[in-house]
């Protein structure tokens, strides 16, 4: 958005007030992360012209996303239909021949940019993400050389780094004079391949990335914490399988 000259407004860090607001708008069956999402949307009301909520269906037949990611935009639009909030979205659905780059270019064009400018903005953003991810992986791998107890914390990035539900766990490990290693410090394509060493039939791409991180790090750490946002459906199945297949390795 910044490359397109559009000002960005970021919701505040998660806190109890925001979580309570999200619980108010979400149904009980939603996972905690979904409830926090609705809380963040409500916090942006009146503070921006529109809230960006991508609709991410899949990254191909072997890249299925949790159904919440596909439905977030529609749920948000309907939940806040009587509020002063507008939404913009893009559809990432490789099975329907709409890859991520095309989806974001179409979004940029819908916001008034030329196709060339939208493509340039996407490519610069993707390159910046790649550089940041490479630096993050190098930082976490360097922590493996620490002589203290090392704990691999396995969870989705939106949970791991949330100030209210994930960061306290990472800080708690550090306060115990141990070293937390975050599971997202992996090359995502390599992690998906490595996940096959644990299970070959997991449909969700993000779950396979978690499995791949365990395959990469489990021999170099002293313990593993599985961080799950209750009642996440995919995680509830994957975690049990992880425990059974990793505990004796």
What do the predicted segments below correspond to?
Residues 2-249:
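An N-terminal assembly and electron-transfer interface module characteristic of large anaerobic redox
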């Amino acid at each position: 958005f910044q490359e397109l000259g559009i000002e960005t407004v970021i919701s505040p860090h998660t806190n109890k007030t925001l979580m309570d607001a999200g619980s108010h708008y979400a149904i009980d069956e939603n996972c905690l992360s979904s409830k926090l999402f609705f809380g963040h949307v409500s916090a942006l009301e009146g503070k921006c012209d529109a809230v960006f909520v991508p609709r991410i269906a899949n990254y191909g037949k072997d890249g299925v996303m949790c159904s919440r990611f596909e439905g977030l935009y529609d749920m948000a639009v309907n939940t806040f239909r009587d509020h002063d909030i507008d939404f913009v979205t893009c559809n990432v659905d490789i099975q329907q021949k709409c890859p991520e780059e095309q989806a974001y270019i179409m979004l940029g064009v819908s916001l008034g940019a030329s196709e060339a400018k939208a493509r340039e903005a996407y490519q610069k953003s993707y390159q910046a993400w790649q550089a940041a991810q490479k630096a993050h992986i190098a930082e976490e791998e360097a922590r493996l050389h620490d002589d203290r107890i090392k704990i691999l914390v396995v969870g989705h990035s939106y949970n791991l780094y949330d100030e209210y539900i994930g960061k306290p766990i990472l800080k708690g490990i550090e306060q115990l004079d141990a070293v937390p290693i975050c599971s997202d410090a992996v090359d995502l394509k390599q992690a998906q391949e490595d996940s096959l060493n644990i299970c070959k039939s997991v449909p969700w791409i993000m779950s396979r990335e978690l499995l791949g991180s365990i395959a990469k790090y489990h021999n170099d750490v002293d313990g593993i914490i599985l961080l799950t946002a209750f009642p996440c459906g995919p995680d509830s199945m994957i975690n049990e399988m992880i425990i059974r297949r990793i505990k004796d390795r």
